[in-house]
């Protein structure tokens, strides 16, 4: 409704049709606004030159297509250019329940911008000798950086910002002696910082009252989290993802349990074989960065920090339940990195692979039977989830690639393709009798 209302009112900064004093539309779920801040919202650009209906189509299509492309590029980096695995993984990210159930809200936007920044950071260093590509990557940093900041949902934003910091610092350390810094770096980095800073100053001057009002609310502004609150079922709620498009969860809501698929327990237990040693140092660097972030997230979720330290680190804005979603995103990237690595380097002994499979089956079964998921799944479904989930892992561990692609692709389709219906046009809204009457009054 925000987006369509903006199109009807010529995209004002403050839409007077909402609330007593109007609604600041930059803060309102990244709605399209004729303002410089729209630079950071590329999926909204279509509203300005395609009209209301086609602009909305542009929003959905661009967000989906570009997220697939960004996910593909990030995974090509992580997997050392394994195209088939990267393509399946890109669809697994874009059509993950975590993204699809929150597609027009914070998660969809933040994952989009995070993937964009990860791509731009990497290629800025990796292709440093190509000045035109360096310039293009910094332009993407400006666009995605502005977009990331303006989502303004710290419960997810803070953790994903930490992931980006870990990722950037890791790349900076690795490439610091491999690139020759020059004047162009000073111009690009300095220019990007100044431009982003200028946009943020403009945003503050035009939206200060609305932003302060939001931050002074009980939720999310005054909420203070210290971490350390979790249940086993929350970590494994992605096990429900295949079912919730067809039957609503009975102990929460579908968006709260929607996560990214991953095999983090397996990767953690296999880490002595895949994360240590000097061979493939760049690839191991990326895996180590993701593992460190996952462990950082787990520490916050399970142990927590004193209030004063949580506030200094901004983690006070991050409830553990929200942190689990960010953790699952990084764990998904790590899992795909892991699969690519063991397909290239057969470093895990066969006997240990069977131990990993047994632990996986037991952890799935235990997580379901010792959580609220036990009342959502039937006994047959519980066993089926444990068995089929372990079978998918077996396909990955033993390198049965075609079977893995087939079954995992089917899982992605079932879990994500049926969440948001395909609709043609906006007639379902504007052709209704109440809508027509409202438009007459507005005229």
Task: Show which residues each predicted segment covers.
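Juxtamembrane membrane-water interface segments that cap and precede transmembrane helices
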Residues: 19-20, 43-47, 230-255, 308-314, ...
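Membrane-helix boundary/interfacial segments in multi-pass membrane proteins
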Residues: 54, 58, 98-109, 282-286, ...
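Extracytoplasmic
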Residues: 401-406, 411-443
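Membrane-interfacial entry segments at the cytosolic side of transmembrane helices
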Residues: 131-136, 176-192, 281-286, 346-355, ...
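Membrane-embedded helix bundles of polyisoprenyl
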Residues: 65-77, 83-175, 185-207, 359-367, ...
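Active-site lumenal/periplasmic loops and adjacent helix-entry segments of GT-C-fold
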Residues: 1-112
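Periplasmic/ER-lumenal interhelical loops and adjacent helix-loop junctions
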Residues: 201-286
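Transmembrane alpha-helical segments
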Residues: 67-75, 114-125, 165-170, 174, ...
């Amino acid at each position: 409704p925000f987006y369509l209302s903006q199109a009807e009112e010529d995209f004002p900064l403050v839409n007077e049709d909402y609330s007593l004093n109007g609604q600041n539309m930059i803060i309102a779920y990244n709605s399209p606004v004729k303002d410089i801040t729209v630079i950071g919202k590329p999926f909204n650009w279509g509203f300005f030159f395609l009209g209301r209906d086609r602009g909305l189509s542009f929003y959905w299509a661009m967000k989906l297509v570009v997220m697939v492309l960004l996910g593909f590029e990030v995974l090509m980096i992580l997997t050392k250019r394994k195209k088939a695995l990267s393509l399946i993984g890109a669809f697994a990210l874009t059509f993950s329940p975590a993204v699809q159930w929150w597609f027009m809200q914070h998660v969809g936007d933040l994952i989009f911008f995070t993937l964009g920044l990860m791509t731009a950071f990497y290629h800025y260093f990796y292709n440093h000798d190509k000045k035109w590509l360096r310039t293009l990557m910094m332009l993407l940093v400006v666009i995605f950086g502005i977009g990331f900041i303006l989502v303004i949902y710290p419960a997810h934003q803070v953790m994903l910002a930490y992931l980006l910091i870990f990722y950037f610092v890791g790349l900076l350390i690795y490439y610091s002696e491999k690139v020759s810094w020059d004047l162009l770096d000073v111009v690009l980095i300095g220019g990007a910082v100044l431009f982003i800073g200028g946009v943020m100053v403009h945003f503050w001057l035009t939206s200060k009252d609305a932003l302060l009002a939001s931050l002074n609310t009980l939720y999310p502004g005054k909420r203070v989290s210290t971490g350390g609150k979790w249940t086993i079922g929350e970590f494994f709620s992605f096990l429900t993802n295949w079912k919730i498009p067809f039957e609503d969860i009975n102990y929460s809501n579908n968006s709260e349990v929607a996560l990214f698929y991953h095999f983090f327990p397996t990767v953690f237990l296999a880490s002595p074989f895949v994360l240590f040693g000097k061979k493939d140092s760049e690839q191991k660097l990326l895996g180590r960065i993701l593992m460190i972030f996952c462990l950082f997230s787990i520490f916050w979720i399970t142990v927590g920090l004193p209030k004063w330290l949580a506030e200094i680190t901004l983690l006070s804005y991050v409830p553990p339940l929200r942190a689990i979603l960010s953790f699952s995103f990084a764990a998904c990237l790590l899992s795909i990195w892991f699969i690519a690595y063991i397909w290239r380097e057969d470093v895990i002994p066969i006997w240990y692979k069977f131990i990993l499979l047994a632990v996986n089956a037991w952890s799935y079964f235990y997580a379901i039977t010792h959580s609220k998921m036990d009342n959502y799944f039937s006994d047959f479904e519980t066993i089926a989830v444990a068995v089929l989930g372990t079978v998918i892992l077996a396909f990955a561990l033993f390198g049965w690639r075609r079977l893995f692609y087939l079954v995992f692709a089917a899982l992605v389709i079932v879990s994500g393709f049926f969440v948001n219906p395909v609709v043609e046009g906006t007639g379902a809204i504007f052709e209704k009798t109440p809508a027509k009457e409202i438009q007459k009054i507005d005229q």
